[in-house]
Swiss-Prot record:
Catalytic activity, reaction form: uridine(38/39/40) in tRNA = pseudouridine(38/39/40) in tRNA
Key words, A-Z: Isomerase, tRNA processing
Natural source organism: Lysinibacillus sphaericus (strain C3-41)
Molecular function terms from GO: RNA binding; tRNA pseudouridine(38-40) synthase activity
UniProt name for this protein: tRNA pseudouridine synthase A
This enzyme's EC code(s): 5.4.99.12
Amino acid sequence: MRRLKIIISYDGTHFSGYQVQPGERTVQAEIERVLAIMHKEEKVKVTASGRTDARVHATGQTLHFDTPLAIPTDKYRKALNVQLPRDIRVLSVEEVAHDFHARYSVTGKRYRYIWSCEPIQNPFRRHYTVDTNGVKPDVVAMQKAAQAIIGTHDFSCFCAANTSVQDKVRTVTSLQFEWHGEELHMVIEGNGFLYNMVRIIAGTLWEVGIDRRTIENIALVVASEDRDKAGKTAPPQGLYLEKVFY
């Protein structure tokens, strides 16, 4: 048996998330469907670095699975792409050691969140950015406030209340804002992220940018470890899983 690591990109618009759900269209289900065809209807279990929610995108999601097929990796990639729907693309296939694990070998992740600040939003970007109705935030204030998030903290304040995870300590190594034309990008890296953590951070820092929350308030929110003290969860379509580090 060979263990293959694959990196995929997907448009999350028409998926009910990454993880298999009965009766729903998901990224994992589509990949396992195609692998079953390639393996003569034998089920192949795929493991991802983590799940993404409905309408969330990925440009660098990483998976692994075991296969007995002796197909060269480049041909494996082409075979998958021929049969996968057009909103999923396999970017690379690599044979790895058997102790590699797409989830447990992760050392860090990078996410990107995008707001469209155009006076009139481009309709072709509506599924891939969050429309601000022309509002342009104070990015200098947002960047200053972000400094309170960088570092190792208990991030309970930026975690969905319904999570079952007990240990909420994570390390955010970088959090930057960048203008790309009329789009504002938030790029965040860390050793791991809690459920909805990036979207809650985005929603909270956005409030700083539009003067609904002070720069100093963010440090208080982090120290509170209280979800109710943070802002709203930002919409899913602006979020991208950009890269997984090993």
